[in-house]
Amino acid sequence: MEKAKLSSALFAGTHFDRKRFAGDFARFRQGPPAPDVASAAAPSPEKKRKRQSKAKAKKSKKRRAEGADSASDAVEGFSVFKGLAAKKDEDDSEKKVETGKSEDSEVVRRRKEVEREIERAAILRKKFDIHISGQNVPAPLENFEELVSRYGCDSYLVGNLSKLGFQEPTPIQRQAIPILLSGRECFACAPTGSGKTLAFLFPILMKIKPGSKEGVKAVILCPTRELAAQTTRECKKLAKGRKFYIKLMTKDLSKSGNFKDMHCDILISTPLRLDHAVQKRDLDLSRVEYLVLDESDKLFELGFVEVIDSVVKACSNPSIIRSLFSATLPDSIETLARTIMHDAVRVIVGRKNSASSLIKQKLIFAGTEKGKLLALRQSFAESLNPPVLIFVQSKERAKELYKELAFDDVRADVIHADLDEEQRQDAVDNLRAGKTWVLIATEVIARGMDFKGVNCVINYDFPESASAYIHRIGRSGRAGRSGEAITFFTEEDKPFLRNIANVLISSGCEVPSWIKALPKLKRKKHRVNRDPISTLPDED
């Protein structure tokens, strides 16, 4: 204690650098003496061995811990070897880039292929003068073989086409067939004799199953019995080789047919007969898949609209496909038809409401009714090139003209509404067979009837409308053959010349300038009260 006091007295007011003289300062502290710096820096060999063993133990422990961590990391999907993991990540990223590039290139390739298909379709339509209106319209056919490659058509159908003489599809067939096969509804307007019948028959025969006992699968409506019979014959020829039940709705079948037990795949009929069978005989049309209105403009004329509406309602299948085919498609008819159709495609070949450019058309001024008879006899004397169709405006005038030609040693026949079905069919068959040279007819035969090789059509009486004119002259110039159409007109017909002249102009025929200068008429139809044709004395 005294030493401490003495030390305090000696060193009072003096400052020591404790850091600098740490060793010396420690000597004056109480407790065990601290080791000097030299001894701390140089430990004994024994301590060195202990420290080394502890360090080794720590390192081994650390390695074991790292091994455990890396093992757990491997379980979670990470590589133990960082270099390999980095390389793998690079490879994966490169693969992703390559996959992305390949996907992008595939999208580009598909887009280019679609663009090429659209371009090919546009070129084909332009080549064949096909005009379409609608969304996502299928590409037209290049040939009939595409029906097999694109749509899986049975070979027997293509074989039947070849046997029937069909080598290449006509323009309306190129576009209308793919539309119907794609499940779309359509309006089809094409010149007479352009193959419209085949355009709707072929998809039906491809899509429905033959020999079905589930009821009627397809209904085809025609404005006349003759056209319905002709369509039935063509359908049976095309379906040869398969057991399709194809029925023509005759008068007897309509009135007394047993429709519950009747096997029928395709039913072809006129509107009135079919409506009678539905209303009076309980004909079931609820499973009809295809409804075709052939010569639709005539079917929608006044008097048929209610009947057509009744038939459409009877065909109540929600997935039914409806289509309209005609040589003319007036705007009023199209507007009316669209009320019963959904997402329909409009197809027009050539110009709307025009005649075939293969028909040579002439207008001849005859002055009076007697002048027309003289002009007709003169035409026969100069160049009678049978078979010839002559159109008049009434059955009375048909009978009168037939009597006149009977005295001229011309092998003529007549067809009109007063004849029964068998007589009318005989008259048509005789012209087809060449037994008669001239067939005198009313409008009843102007719709859709196909006479092989009709060379000339003569409009003895001026047609009532441009539409009637197109259908009349369309009996010639069919299936790619040339034809001739002669139209007589009198003073009474002059006011109506302009409407017919427009058809001639659109078909590329020459029309005198004075006819072009005539005023347009708002009336679409007319019927002139004409003097009798006959120059013979009345029979008492």
Swiss-Prot record:
Database matches in PROSITE patterns: HELICASE_ATP_BIND_1, HELICASE_CTER, Q_MOTIF
Coiled coil: 101-129
Short motif (DEAD box): ranges: 294-297
InterPro entries: DDX52/Rok1_DEADc (IPR044764), DEAD/DEAH_box_helicase_dom (IPR011545), DEAD_box_RNA_helicase (IPR050079), Helicase_ATP-bd (IPR014001), Helicase_C-like (IPR001650), P-loop_NTPase (IPR027417), RNA_helicase_DEAD_Q_motif (IPR014014)
Pfam families: DEAD, Helicase_C
Keyword vocabulary terms for this entry: ATP-binding, Coiled coil, Helicase, Hydrolase, Nucleotide-binding, RNA-binding
GO biological process, one term: maturation of SSU-rRNA
Start-end of Basic residues biased regions: 47-64
SUPFAM superfamilies xref list: P-loop containing nucleoside triphosphate hydrolases (SSF52540)
Sites where the protein binds ATP: A190, P191, T192, G193, S194, G195, K196, T197
Molecular function GO labels: ATP binding; ATP hydrolysis activity; RNA binding; RNA helicase activity
Domain spans labelled Helicase C-terminal: 375-519
Renumbered residue ranges of the record's region Disordered: 24-73
Helicase ATP-binding domain span: 177-347
CDD domains for the chain: DEADc_DDX52 (cd17957), SF2_C_DEAD (cd18787)
SMART domains for the chain: DEXDc, HELICc
Record's comment describing the protein's domains: The Q motif is unique to and characteristic of the DEAD box family of RNA helicases and controls ATP binding and hydrolysis.
Family: Belongs to the DEAD box helicase family. DDX52/ROK1 subfamily.
Protein name: DEAD-box ATP-dependent RNA helicase 57
Lineage: Eukaryota, Viridiplantae, Streptophyta, Embryophyta, Tracheophyta
